[in-house]
From Swiss-Prot:
Keywords: ATP synthesis, Cell inner membrane, Cell membrane, CF(1), Hydrogen ion transport, Ion transport, Membrane, Transport. Belongs to the ATPase gamma chain family. The gene is atpG. CDD domains: F1-ATPase_gamma. The keyword Transcription regulation does not apply. GO terms for molecular function: ATP binding; proton-transporting ATP synthase activity, rotational mechanism. It is found in: Cell inner membrane. It is a peripheral membrane protein. This is ATP synthase gamma chain. InterPro entries: ATP_synth_F1_ATPase_gsu, ATP_synth_F1_gsu, ATP_synth_F1_gsu_CS.
Length: 291
């Protein structure tokens, strides 16, 4: 059995680790609230752009945007959203497993894939598996800006417009709640027809008629680009909210485990110390009896 000094050293080490994980848990909780607020704030913009584009598309059905053209899928673009840092449980592992399954499925059908990495972990993963990475953006920080994302996203959007890829997929982690995050692989392009359909309530709300400059088609084309960019930004915002939630939960679990380990070590320490005292008393009694 280890000596009391060695056990005290272990207890001190675990206590120091618990202080670190507790601090990281508190920081993640603070960042999580901000990330969730940012995620909620991003949703109305994308929805407003979608409604305006849907109204214009309904009013001008003769306009056919390249983003809505369906082709036989021979080449695919994949935008992979991950975190820059670790210590967030199985968040990245789960989404990258979904990406791996999708890549295997596509490659099994003879489909070529080119990837865009958003986040360091995704960039490292795509490099390890030898994927063709055509653009990337890393080190977004705690506050993602659309300006940083546009360059990497535009590579895939232009590739689809020019016919270099026939579909674009978006992989990210969807925020469900603090305890649950779900890996997603969704088709980004071509836009499904239901994306630009309107409910009766939306039709009444957007029943206005304006004069557009330079013309309605140009406005629709620009709006659809903004809408797709907003969808990617929303995915990044959801991924960041998921990251901070997963990190908070992971650090809380680490802190709780450290507390349990400290309790177990303290019990071992007490037993060891008690055994040492009992042994000393026995030796004293034996010595006294011998005299």
């Amino acid at each position: 059995m280890a000596g009391t000094k060695e056990i005290r050293t272990k207890i001190k080490s675990v206590q120091n680790t618990r202080k670190i994980t507790k601090a990281m848990e508190m920081v993640a909780a603070s960042k999580m609230r901000k990330a969730q607020e940012r995620m909620r704030n991003a949703r109305p913009y994308a929805e407003k752009v979608r409604n305006i584009a849907a109204h214009l598309a309904t009013a001008n059905p003769e306009f056919k945007h390249p983003f809505m053209q369906e082709r036989e899928v021979k080449r695919v673009g994949m935008i992979v959203v991950t975190t820059d840092k670790g210590l967030c449980g199985g968040l990245n592992t789960n989404v990258l497993r979904s990406v791996t399954n999708e890549l295997k499925s596509l490659q099994g059908r003879g489909v070529d894939v080119q990837a865009t990495a958003i986040g360091t972990k995704g960039m490292q993963f795509l490099g390890r598996i030898g994927a063709k990475v055509v653009s990337h953006v890393v080190h977004l920080g705690d506050t993602p800006h659309l300006e940083k994302l546009i360059g990497a996203i535009k590579v895939q959007l232009d590739a689809f417009t020019n016919g270099e890829v026939d579909a674009v997929y978006l992989a990210y982690t969807k925020f469900i709640n603090t305890m649950k995050q779900e890996p997603m692989v969704e088709q980004l392009l071509p836009l499904a027809a239901d994306k630009l359909s309107q409910t009766e309530e939306e039709k009444r709300a957007y029943s206005w008629d304006y004069i557009y400059e330079p013309d309605a088609q140009t406005v629709v084309e620009e709006l659809l680009v903004r809408y797709v960019e907003a969808l990617v930004y929303q995915a990044v915002a959801e991924n960041m909210a998921s990251e901070q939630s997963a990190r908070m939960v992971a650090m809380k679990a680490a802190s709780d485990n450290a507390k349990n380990v400290i309790g177990e070590l303290q019990l071992v320490y007490n037993k060891t110390r008690q055994a040492a005292i009992t042994k000393e008393l026995s030796e004293i009694v034996s010595g006294a009896a011998a005299v």
